[in-house]
Structure formats: C-alpha cells, structure tokens
Design a protein with these regions (language model features):
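Aromatic/hydrophobic pocket-lining residues that form the small-molecule binding cavity
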Residues: 31, 62, 154-158
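Pocket-forming structural segment of enzyme catalytic cores
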Residues: 98-99, 104-123, 140
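Conserved beta-strand hairpin/beta-sheet module of binuclear metal-dependent hydrolase folds
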Residues: 1-45, 121-133
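Active-site neighborhood of phospho(di)ester-bond hydrolases with catalytic His/Asp-centered motifs
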Residues: 28-29, 50-58, 76-81, 111-114, ...
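Hydrophobic residues at beta-strand termini and immediately following loops
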Residues: 6, 94, 185
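Divalent metal-coordination and catalytic microenvironments
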Residues: 18, 30, 56, 68, ...
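Metallo-beta-lactamase
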Residues: 116-215
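Active-site HxH/HxHxD metal-binding segment of metal-dependent hydrolases
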Residues: 12, 23-26, 33-108, 190-194, ...
C-alpha cells in the first residue's frame, strides 16, 4: 500500500491518501485537510477514491468531509458504529477488529476510546503501519480534557491494543506534534513516559503531570 501524507488543517492536522498499488483504489484517512492538493494527487496517480476512514468525529477531523462527498457522491464513509455522527446514506458502521478491504489490501479496525468514545485506529498488518488519529501521537497520547474523554479507556486502548502490535509497526498520527511525522512503536516507547507505564495508576499520573505542564 502507498501512503501520502498531507499537513495542514486546524492544528497541524495530518490527512493521508492511501491506495492499493494493484488496483489503484484509494482511501483517505480523516477529512481534515483542504482537498485541492489531495485531488491533484488522486488525478496524477490515476486513482479511484472509494472510501474515507474517520478516526474520530472531532470537528477538525471531519471538517472537509462535505467537500469530498460533493466531489465524490458515491464515497463510502467508514467510522465507528456507535458514533453520534451519521454523515450520509453511505456511512459504514465499523466494529472492533472488523477487516475492511481497499482493493486487495486489508485494514483492521481497532476501537481505541479514551480521547473520544468513537476513536478508532486503522492497522495494515502486511504493510506494518497503523493510523492512530488522536489516540497516539509521536511522543505522547491524545489528551483527555473533554467531557467525553476517559483516562482509563485510553490506558486500555494504548496498552491492550496499540502496544500489543508488532514493535516495528509505524504509527501515522492525526497531528504533527512530534519531532517528526511518524515513528515505529518501538521508538515511541523509548522516547516517551506515556508508553513506559507499569500500571493504569502510573499512566494517569503521567497524563496529569503533562496537563500540569500545559497550565504552567
């Protein structure tokens, strides 16, 4: 699978155009970037855009979804089954560990609540990469300051799901907040105390300490 990252949006957002090399069928991870450059890439690579994958429904990750569906009315919108947002008749409700096809490629859905209840990550086992939205960034997790956020859920999502993936899995996050756009899980663990905790209580302390630094 090929991956092209696009940086912009509300706050260093990252959208990704992905496609199956064998079929030229493409998808977009998060509609968070103004679409002109993405459309140019679709045209220049002779791609057929089939799906948009939504990592969660915070406004900045779906801001340009209407622009995409205006251009491609047949688009299938793929998001978590219990999301409060239902975008179009083409909305596909995803379940935990469901497998989606994109051409000949297979993508596994991982429900990863914590930052937001409908957060999901999209893992391609063959390519050894995962799109983590706002669940995991380079160097830290997503924040849990919203009324629907939950530290305990985020701990489970990180330690029982993402950190159980192969250590050489490359993460592609929803924002460019780190020293580079993507790293392996192994590297992320080595550089961040968020991913070195031995218990949920320790993880929550790390989260609270981080928020304290934001206030100072």
């Amino acid at each position: 699978m090929q991956i092209k990252a696009f940086l912009g949006g509300y706050d260093k957002n990252l959208s990704y155009l992905i496609w199956c090399e064998a079929t030229r069928i493409a998808g977009i991870i998060d509609a968070s970037i103004e679409i002109t450059e993405i459309l140019e890439c679709i045209d220049s690579n002779n791609l057929l855009l089939e799906k948009v994958f939504i990592t969660h429904t915070h406004f900045d990750h779906i801001k340009y979804l209407d622009d995409l569906t205006d251009q491609f009315p047949y688009l299938q919108i793929c998001g978590y089954k219990n999301s409060e947002e239902k975008f179009t008749d083409n909305y596909r409700e995803l379940d935990h560990h469901e497998i989606i096809t994109l051409g000949t490629e297979m993508i596994t859905v991982l429900h990863t609540p914590g930052h937001y209840p409908d957060s999901v990550c999209f893992w391609n086992k063959k390519g050894n990469f995962v799109f983590t939205g706002d669940t995991m960034f380079v160097g830290r997790t997503g924040r849990t300051i919203g009324p629907k956020s939950n530290n305990s859920c985020l701990y489970s999502s990180i330690y029982d799901e993402l950190l159980k993936l192969p250590q050489q899995t490359v993460i592609y996050p929803g924002h460019h907040y780190g020293y580079k756009k993507s790293v392996t899980l192994k590297e992320n663990i080595s550089l961040s105390p968020f991913f070195q905790c031995n218990s949920e209580d320790e993880f929550i302390r790390v989260m609270e300490d981080y928020e304290e630094t934001r206030r100072n």
